[in-house]
Amino acid sequence: MSIDVEPTGRPRVLVVGGKPKLVRKARELGLDVVHAQYPDAYDRVHWPHVDQALLLDYGDMDRFLPLARALHEVYPFQSAVALFELGLLPAARINEELGLNGESVETVELLLDKWRMRQRLAEKGISPMASAIGRSAQDVRDFVKAHGLPIIVKPVRESGSVGVFRVDDEAGVEAVAGRYRSLDDEQWAVGDLFSADSFDEFLMEEYLDGPEISVETLSFDGRHVVCAITDKAAFGGGSGFVELGLSQPSRHPEETLDEVRRLVADFLDAVGLRNGPGHTEIRLTSRGPRIIESHNRIGGYGVNEMVETAYGVDMERYTLGVRFGLVEPLASAPEPLGGVALQALTPEPGRVVEVNGVDAVRADPAFVDLHVKVKPGDVVNPLTWNEDIGGYVIARGADATEAIAHSKRLAAAIHVRTEPVA
């Protein structure tokens, strides 16, 4: 590989996947940027912030790794970074293969593979939960016979609430394996799924009662700092697991949150996460907090913008900057500056005719951010996973309660009119 480049003396990062704002923030920190991205996800908005681009399916490591190695030889980068689910393992593989700084492949694999994560927690005696791998309706029957109803059936790998089902009765027991297999027939886009065989087997777990929260962390050489605890206020969709409302700071009792903080620190130690972001989902059950799953990335939707609004911490900037010595690690958990809430936009399924109210929402004093995913001509699908929402609005308030009210008000002001698809 021959590339004519002028040395800049700046540290250089390989950013694997993710949104344009990540390469922009890398550039703002003073980094040279190499960007690996799907060809159809790379356009002129990236150009001012990217020095070299590798446009390919970066999940195909047989192609990606040789190209990254060859580029590294003539245009060396100090670390590969990913904050998008499907980029986490490729980034870790490249760092390991090239001897660069980053989280271990073992840690990333533990967090991506929910069954391996459960086994590790069982070994450590952390967050006990009945679970097993299934491949057939008989496996579901056997698990229910051993542990009772309700249960949760979900992919071993995947995120965004795709393929998550709650089974409440015998009819559900008989149907869930078939529903799961039918996911193979869906038309998934590149970047939707971790792998083509994601639905060959599933994870069965006992159902956890109680409200759900997520814990947003940054780790610095094994020291875990809780940046925020996010309340998940509303769920919806056919599965009942599509996240529709989020808020910070958490409104749960401080005694409960202290227990959560201790659990998350023990969990991150158990999986070996030493540096960078974490997004750990937890149920506050009648038996105490229990781990649902975790990721070595920042939470999806607008969680980074929420943490920055409520606590003044840009987790993306810390993820990039601390690794290269451009940002000082957080000394302690930040104190809240106010409240913030996110409300999903859930237009009626059908073809989008018009979208109104955007300008008025952006001008509102409570406005923080708005992401409308649909435009006239697009088709809105029924809610089955997080990617089916029509977008979201984020609002601020004096506290979480006020922010929730503002977010609902602003979401209601966005009018997405649809018509039936012929």
What are these regions (language model features)?
Residues M1-T107, L112, Q138, G325, ...:
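ATP-binding N-terminal substructure of ATP-dependent carboxylate-amine bond-forming enzymes
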Residues E97-G163, G178, S182-G191:
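A conserved helix-loop-beta module that forms one wall/lid of the active-site cleft
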Residues P128-M129, P150-V153, E170-D209, L244, ...:
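Conserved ATP-binding module of the ATP-grasp superfamily
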Residues A171, F199, E206-L273, P277, ...:
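ATP-dependent carboxylate/phosphate-activation module, predominantly the ATP-grasp catalytic core
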Residues S182-D185, R362-A366, L410-P420:
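A common structural junction motif
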Residues A189-D192, N275-T280, L330-P334, R417-A422:
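Flexible, glycine/charged-enriched surface loops at secondary-structure junctions
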Residues G278, V361-V379:
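A structural supersecondary motif
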Residues V327-A366:
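A glycine-rich beta-turn/hairpin centered on an aromatic-Pro dipeptide
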